[in-house]
Amino acid sequence: MSLPVVALVGRPNVGKSTIFNRIINSRVAIVEDKAGVTRDRIYARAEWMGHEFILIDTGGITLDSGEIEEQIKAQAEIAIDEADVIVMLGDVTQHMTNMDETIAKMLYRTKKPVILAINKADNPEQRTDIYDFYSLGLGDPIPVSGSHGTGMGDLLDAIVGEFGDKANQHEDGSIRFSVIGRPNVGKSSLVNAILGEQRVIVSNIEGTTRDAIDTTFTNDGQKYTIVDTAGIRRRGKVYEKTEKYSVLRAISAIEESDITLLVLDASTGIREQDKHVAGYAHDAGRGVIIVVNKWDLPKKDSRSMKDFEDTIRREFQYLDYAPIIFVSAKTGQRVPDILKLVKEVHENQTRRIQSSVLNDLLLEATRITPTPLVNGKRLRIYYMTQVAVTPPTFVVFVNDPELLHFSYQRFLINQLRQNFDFVGTPIKILARKRK
């Protein structure tokens, strides 16, 4: 399912990051009372009244010609291009400015739904001052206060009201997998090798894949869909006009997938950006397969594969469940095994365990390692049941959810992995108080 994308845009210092944090209930974005502090797009999953969406916080759009200002403008333009709904923010304390008018004209030309929200309306008097913004031609402005939280319900109602059918698109029954990684690790070549034909532009120049490509095919009676991306640019680079891909595009591909192939370059080793990409895949709760490409290039001895695998496990400790496969898209080495792994991981991430079996496991697990004491109070787990797949999600009913420490939660996850085949998929355990 493809999640709707919502972009927060506006001139600097109107409070976009504060609104962003208020919506996602977190302080992911840096909030500082200084224009231009949010330079890169920041994105997170958000939810309102059962509607999930991807929220983007952008740097303020300016007309200044400095390098940083140009980067901010480029980032915002890409966010606007990718968005299904755009929220333009104004600042009631600074009233409407010429810059607001310029941004409104730019947004009007996109032909996309635009919601006008006026921030910093912290008291009744300020809420009546928003009417200057009617002249922007973007409809009724919604007064909000990012710092106090007032008006946020009205804003979120307006946002989800624009989603239409976007949030209700269903998959066609195929196993969908995305191919992600930083530029030039060989994603396009790998897709070509899997498909056995040229379907996308391939060259050694970063970002030569010009648009998103979803390709559906059948292998051994199983239908697959590849969601291909052009990788993730290094932070701080200005995007070229023809470059449509970004961190957001990779996240969108992950969200639309059941499984993600995280592609690493054997010839260059693991870089910091690889870790960022891996984090997106893990956080989305999708299945993950680590594909080490270009294995034909590095000079190797008999231990090099083991050494590289050890490095991966050390650098990506949170992906300890992900299988690793070493391939060469150029020579075709082990490429046929990728689809076998995709099918296996899909079976694992959709696996359901009967409650009676789970509770037998729980009884044995708590016997091996008793539940902990927290401030003199012992955690009591009454029973466990599976409530979802993709990823497999389990609920334990307890006397007090606050007593389930992450270390004991990790112990229970390890017990599940030891007893059932969950290779390639994360596992979630939620605690609920027994009524």
UniProtKB/Swiss-Prot annotation:
**Example GO biological process:** ribosome biogenesis
**Residues at which GTP 2 binds:** 181-188, 228-232, 293-296
Q: What is this protein called?
A: GTPase Der
Q: Please tell me the species this chain comes from.
A: Lactobacillus johnsonii (strain CNCM I-12250 / La1 / NCC 533)
- Annotated signal sequence is none
**UniProt xrefs under InterPro entries:** G_ENGA, GTP-bd, GTPase_Der, KH_dom-like, KH_dom-like_a/b, P-loop_NTPase, Small_GTP-bd
All copies of the KH-like domain together span 351-435
State the superkingdom.
Bacteria
This protein's UniProt keywords: GTP-binding, Nucleotide-binding, Repeat, Ribosome biogenesis
Q: Quaternary arrangement and interactors, per the entry?
A: Associates with the 50S ribosomal subunit.
Q: What is the purpose of this protein?
A: GTPase that plays an essential role in the late steps of ribosome biogenesis.
Tell me the residue numbers annotated for binding GTP 1.
Answer: 10-17, 57-61, 119-122
Q: Name one GO molecular function term.
A: GTP binding
Q: Which family does it belong to?
A: Belongs to the TRAFAC class TrmE-Era-EngA-EngB-Septin-like GTPase superfamily. EngA (Der) GTPase family.
Which HAMAP family does the record cross-reference, listed alphabetically?
GTPase_Der
Stretches assigned to the EngA-type G domain: 4-167, 175-350
